[in-house]
Amino acid sequence: MRQYELMIILDPSQDERTVAPSLDKFLEVVRKDKGDVVKVDVWGKRRLAYPINKKEEGIYAVIDLKCESATVLELDRVLNLNDGVLRTKVLRLDK
């Protein structure tokens, strides 16, 4: 298994109290494939450097994962299908 860092920018119209449950729903993909969610860090609402989908702000979350590469591809696919997710970025961490 490899370590990954996933940054997600969510739609700012979401209530910040509902961010953690919605992230949990996405992370079920990782847990289902016997991966491990090491850390979830929600940064909260921040101003974007440039507008994304006509939004000036976004709710940032950084997640550390330990899983297989196929699981990360599936997670990225699921996130991109959701309208509440503005942008994602997955980085593979060095050992």
Curated annotation (Swiss-Prot):
Keywords for the protein's UniProt record, in alphabetical order: Ribonucleoprotein, Ribosomal protein, RNA-binding, rRNA-binding
HAMAP family: Ribosomal_bS6 (MF_00360)
GO terms for biological process, alphabetical: translation
Natural source organism: Corynebacterium efficiens (strain DSM 44549 / YS-314 / AJ 12310 / JCM 11189 / NBRC 100395)
CDD domains: bS6
Function noted in UniProt: Binds together with bS18 to 16S ribosomal RNA.
Family classification: Belongs to the bacterial ribosomal protein bS6 family.
Keyword Ribosomal protein in annotation: yes
Protein name: Small ribosomal subunit protein bS6
GO cellular component: a single term: cytoplasm
InterPro entries, per database record: Ribosomal_bS6, Ribosomal_bS6_CS, Ribosomal_bS6_sf, Ribosomal_S6_plastid/chlpt, Transl_elong_EF1B/ribsomal_bS6
A GO MF term: small ribosomal subunit rRNA binding
Gene transcribed to yield this protein: rpsF
Upper taxonomic lineage: Bacteria, Bacillati, Actinomycetota, Actinomycetes, Mycobacteriales
Source organism, top-level taxon: Bacteria
